[in-house]
Regions:
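N-terminal secretory signal peptides
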Residues: 1-42, 53
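Asparagine-centered strand-capping/turn motif at beta-strand->loop junctions
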Residues: 126-130, 290, 443-447
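Acidic-aromatic/histidine active-site loop/patch
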Residues: 213-282, 289-292, 415-418, 422
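Active/binding-pocket-proximal capping segment
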Residues: 302-315, 420, 446-473, 505-509, ...
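N-terminal edge beta-strand
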Residues: 97-115, 265-276, 411-435
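Extended terminal and domain-junction accessory segments
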Residues: 50, 58, 63-84, 187, ...
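Hydrophobic or amphipathic alpha-helical targeting/insertion segments
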Residues: 162, 166-203
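Extracytoplasmic beta-sandwich strand-turn segments characteristic of Greek-key/jelly-roll folds
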Residues: 109, 113-114, 140-172, 271-276, ...
Length: 519
């Protein structure tokens, strides 16, 4: 008999005892069986009957999704799921007297913290209580395309008022997350403008070090609206100069941009949620996630510094201490803070307007009270290469230039985005890549916008950032500033469709994506 599982309990600022954080890489994914149908079923016979209708098709689809084989295991579909995500309407009290109605997971924003063990298969239940089909993307995991949760990769969707169950093997270890991958276009009640996101932490197999608290903090913005003002990138000391491409400029003015009224960390505006409680002498491990639809952010903890140990869930070769973290949309940073400065402090964005509208959280030492303090951090450029090493990287077997372009939408219009001169075309033949072959992707940003670009179902290694060679830094999102280049190497680990796109929702919706097919 199949039962719906109890919903995980959401924790606004979860704290845990010491956990192991070592990583191992690239075990093979096995899709056992998937079924898209209404539930619950009252008997095993009814369930298996439903699985026959939906499961046979999905089993075939999984088999072609690059998993390296799949097996039918009816027993795996019985009993409670290991992970349940219920998609539905959520009311979020973000500030005193200010509530947001949105769509989220399991009745909360962020959704439940999902802790999994690397390489241990789990049964996942996705339950959609809304009137529209949904896509659930396991960001940063190496899984078959059919389970990756995108329309472009022909992934399985969760039908309106329906249910989807499948098996997946979590990998690789580290901080990942799960979020909707619906393309909302200008509908700000759908897609990543909503509260459909949750941390996924895949437990590694060995201990990364000592810490006293572990905190998961996700940033998000609310109440988006269209405007004509284009936000310019701030001047950052130490950042190489931008070099706009030669030739005539677009005669049309810039199109619509998106702005927000409210900013939150873990669904609460600064000063409204409970403070983070710490003690002097503690080592606190922070897992940060930029869960914004469109905004790149910076974060600082007044009176303290961050020891960065992982980027996008992957340990860095050379941990470094920094004053400010920068996260493009969908980037994650793991950093340890040594609590050596007793007081009541603000952890938040250096941008005063955004901080005053909520982007921050209070950090309070034991036996300390009073108004939280903010101290502006020094202005320095974020440099990925400081976390890399100097070893030589293997030469790529093929180099693929990817030139990012922009076509201004004009007043009252929407900008269009291109890769190598073309916007995304769902009817175009995907670019073929060979499994196991090392490719160098050259991200050549010829626009004045910063682009957090994301490659699905793989991590890539940074090899050159704004003219500085580097190696050893593995990521799945990298922020390419305006008029600059970043080079990365990737060796596709799984066959099947593989999506590349800008994680800025507005850019992705209006053309900034490309589909590969790994064979």
């Amino acid at each position: 008999m199949i039962h719906s599982t109890p919903l995980e309990t959401p924790v606004p600022n979860p704290t845990f005892v010491e956990k192991p954080v070592d990583r191992s890489w690239w075990s093979r994914e096995r899709c056992i069986l998937s079924a898209s149908m209404q539930f619950p079923f009252s008997t095993r016979r009814q369930f298996l009957s439903g699985a026959t209708l939906g499961g046979s098709l999905l089993y075939t689809a999984c088999r072609h999704g690059g998993a390296g084989g799949a097996s039918v295991d009816a027993e795996a579909l019985e009993g409670p799921a290991d992970v349940t995500l219920r998609i539905g309407t959520v009311k979020v009290d973000i500030a005193k007297g200010h509530a947001i109605s949105t769509t989220g997971y399991n009745g909360a924003v962020p959704g439940p913290l999902i802790r999994l063990r690397e390489g241990v298969p789990v049964t996942v239940d996705l339950v959609n209580d809304t009137a529209a089909a949904e896509l659930v993307h396991w960001h940063g995991q190496v899984i078959p395309a059919r389970l990756d949760g995108t329309e472009e990769e022909k992934s399985l969707e969760v039908p309106a008022h329906g249910h989807l169950r499948y098996r997946l093997t979590p990998q690789p270890a580290g901080a990942r997350f799960v979020h909707t991958h619906v393309m909302p276009m200008a509908d700000f009640m759908r897609g990543t403008y909503t509260g459909q996101f949750a941390f996924v932490y895949i437990e590694p197999k060995s201990n990364p070090g000592q810490y006293d608290q572990e905190l998961f903090l996700a940033t998000h913005e609310w109440e988006p609206s269209l405007g004509s003002e284009e936000e310019e990138e701030e001047d950052e000391p130490g950042l190489p100069p931008a070099t706009p491409p030669p030739g005539p400029k677009d005669p049309n003015p810039n199109g619509w941009e998106i702005g927000y009224q409210r900013f939150t960390i873990n669904g609460k505006c600064l000063g409204y949620g409970a403070p983070i409680q710490v003690k002097e002498g503690q080592r606190v491990l922070f897992h940060f996630l930029n869960a914004s639809a469109t905004e790149n952010i910076k974060l600082a903890l007044a009176g303290h510094q961050f020891d960065v140990i992982s980027l996008d869930g992957n340990p860095v070769p050379r941990p470094e201490r920094v004053d400010v973290l920068e996260l493009g949309t969908a980037e994650r940073i793991d950093a340890v803070v040594q609590m050596r400065n007793p007081g009541v402090w603000i952890l938040g964005t250096p941008k005063a307007d955004d901080r005053n509208n909520g982007m921050g959280i209070v950090v309070e030492y034991a036996n300390r009270k009073g108004q939280p303090r903010w101290i502006a951090p020094p202005k320095t450029a974020w440099d990925y290469t400081q976390f890399g090493d100097n070893r030589a990287t293997p030469l790529p077997q093929e180099t693929i230039p990817l030139v990012f372009g922009k076509i201004n939408g004009g007043k009252g219009g929407f900008n269009r985005w291109t890769i190598n001169g073309k916007g995304y075309d769902s009817k175009a033949e995907p670019r073929r890549l060979m499994k196991g072959k090392r490719y160098r992707l050259v991200f050549d940003n010829q626009t004045d916008d910063a682009h957090p670009v994301h490659l699905h179902r793989n991590s890539f290694e940074l090899t050159n950032v704004y003219g500085k060679p580097t190696s050893g830094v593995l990521k799945d999102v990298v922020l390419v500033k305006g008029y600059r280049k970043i080079e990365v190497d990737v060796t596709p680990a799984e066959e099947g469709l593989m999506l590349f796109h800008c994680h800025q929702q507005f850019h992705m919706d209006y053309g900034f994506k490309l589909l590969f097919n790994v064979v």
